[in-house]
């Protein structure tokens, strides 16, 4: 009989089973992809293993197992309305990189599911689907496993193909939950592989045996691979015998807390249940994403978080929750997912702070959405009695406004919504997401030349910048050759090399490899799939031959500067954590000879004071002259001594610790100074944002920092000369004096402009008209600049407090316009509406609040026409 297991027990059993079968456990990678710009999020178990499947790297073991957290947001609108849609989920997977294939993969799956030692599922409740032409899989299921033919369903769609790269047939395993979930009926898709609640897919085994080529042909892969996926949430629902994933132990503690806060019960009312499921799903996604370095923003993955949070809060309002509360669920998520994912609990305080701040902001956004909807209703009443579908979609997509609420409010106003256009816009968005998803999953075709080179190449560059060595392999035009002529670009390997390969943000060494017969100028060094350093260079003279004895020399000036910048980067990382907080994590870095660049997670710009503090901390550690001790040790010992592992990096059993204790202890494979005093000087030259919740610091060290400061000093001396001051201290005082004088002169000028405008206008009270019962001043004013029209308006408002005032001006052939409406009249007349009506006439746009709005345009010749039009508009209100 099938065992009733907690989700954490299923996860552990899965990992333990495949470890027994010779698999290596690959730890779950962060949700924010590392070194993969094609993905917004890690969205599958295989996403982090692409480097193994496409041959860029060779894993330590060809058999891999993982439990990978993942985010998919292409079907957000379905989450909450179905039993199993999630934005955050865990994918259990076992993988073979050129090792076992269909026979073992199917046998492993069957044993894990049916053995009493593991899941203990009843074999007669399991069905499988296969590709119609995959007779090998059919024979294994039927003859070797003993599954009767009626339980093997052939489906044409059982072929995994996402474009160029590995592809192949797949087999899916289904669990029959029984007649309580539906009677067999092909017309209702009540069969394994159909859309139904009875037969649940619990495992997908992909047999990757073909390359999908650029010309859309298929060729057999030299190394066949296995890629499988089992959703933990779904397997938990089967094991725990509950109707939906949301009733498992992964979700019910969250549901219980929502019940406490809302006073409503889960599983009592279907409409309420949608809100419960949306909140529970989205808080898991948000908490994990923030713990992995993402932050809410207006673009990219930050926008996804913001949209999810808004959607959850919006649904919480249907449960009567009208204040920030999502942040209170973070501790529950952390407790459920610990200890396999300790990161959420470790960062819980920071996660809660970010979520609470976002919740508070959302209520303002919701009010804005309602205001825009009210404007759309007015527009529809004046035209077609239908709210434009594009406007409704924008309201949904930008403000997170539910289309159902838009429809409900529209019906109350006697209107309808153009749902055809809305659905078209929604479908276009889905199509874009689907295309992006397919493109992002595409893997590179395997490179067999480098993959087949297994001879060793030892890096000796930690201790020396030169080496006497042997050239072992030459690759020219994608093929291994024995010799290369002068002028050609070539890739090559050495038995021993002092050249550092680009890694961990540090650029590769450059230099020369030579003997009496030839010379190669080395420009790049990368890692080959089997770990050797692969050098790229141009043959300067002579003929290069495999087996030649050569001298390898690194450019030592560049090497020294790279060492300074790399060690300074470690100090910078530690200083940022000290000043800003432990939430700071490296999000990317670049260590070159002439500069360093460091990207890190932080939710806002650094203040000047924070930048100064960080810079001073780094320089103090430099001036202390701390010895840089570098040791290799096992990962457990490194963590015990407090070494900081870079977020998202994968480490082996033995790691290299760069120790500048007590300030910085970090795992790193790069090249460093021997003492921090060698860095000399550290200077931050810029701090900026690069996207969603990521900041960037660029800095200089040593001579480059000195030259930068020298240049600033020269500019400062020039400024002193122009200001005619003698001492440095007098510069600020002189600038303050000049700024004060400028302000006074501008104020005088502004007053004079007002007086001139007033003289030109004459008695404005005499120009006020009564239109449709309102006092109205509509006029063109002659002002020197666009700013002056606002000050003129302020002057007029003080004299005509009960009057609707609309001013327009022509400044440098551009139209400026401003409108004000007394607050006592804004229920009937809105300044924003007035400007929106006028602006198109002068070739522009505008808007604003009900009591104050402004706009502009590019057709000053139409100012008079726009003023006449607005008078008629007010007359017909």
UniProtKB/Swiss-Prot annotation:
Record keywords: Aminoacyl-tRNA synthetase, ATP-binding, Cytoplasm, Ligase, Metal-binding, Nucleotide-binding, Protein biosynthesis, RNA-binding, tRNA-binding, Zinc
Known cofactor(s): Zn(2+)
SMART domains, per the entry: tRNA_SAD
GO molecular function terms listed in the Swiss-Prot or TrEMBL record: alanine-tRNA ligase activity; aminoacyl-tRNA deacylase activity; ATP binding; catalytic activity, acting on a protein; transferase activity; tRNA binding; zinc ion binding
One CC-aspect GO term: cytosol
Gene Ontology biological process terms, A to Z: alanyl-tRNA aminoacylation
A UniProt-annotated Pfam family: tRNA-synt_2c
CC cofactor note: Binds 1 zinc ion per subunit.
Matching InterPro entries: aa-tRNA-synth_II/BPL/LPL, Ala-tRNA-lgiase_IIc, Ala-tRNA-ligase_IIc_anticod-bd, Ala-tRNA-synth_IIc_core, Ala-tRNA-synth_IIc_N, Ala-tRNA_ligase, Ala_tRNA_ligase_euk/bac, DHHA1_dom
Matching SUPFAM superfamilies: Class II aaRS and biotin synthetases, Putative anticodon-binding domain of alanyl-tRNA synthetase (AlaRS), ThrRS/AlaRS common domain, Translation proteins
Matching Gene3D superfamilies: 2.40.30.130, 3.10.310.40, 3.30.54.20, Bira Bifunctional Protein, Domain 2, Threonyl-trna Synthetase, Chain A, domain 2
Catalytic activity: tRNA(Ala) + L-alanine + ATP = L-alanyl-tRNA(Ala) + AMP + diphosphate
Catalytic EC class: ligase
Family per record: Belongs to the class-II aminoacyl-tRNA synthetase family.
Record note on domains: Consists of three domains; the N-terminal catalytic domain, the editing domain and the C-terminal C-Ala domain. The editing domain removes incorrectly charged amino acids, while the C-Ala domain, along with tRNA(Ala), serves as a bridge to cooperatively bring together the editing and aminoacylation centers thus stimulating deacylation of misacylated tRNAs.
UniProt xrefs under PANTHER family: ALANINE--TRNA LIGASE, CYTOPLASMIC, ALANYL-TRNA SYNTHETASE
Function: Catalyzes the attachment of alanine to tRNA(Ala) in a two-step reaction: alanine is first activated by ATP to form Ala-AMP and then transferred to the acceptor end of tRNA(Ala). Also edits incorrectly charged Ser-tRNA(Ala) and Gly-tRNA(Ala) via its editing domain.
Name listed for the protein in its UniProt record: Alanine--tRNA ligase
Protein source organism: Staphylococcus aureus (strain USA300 / TCH1516)
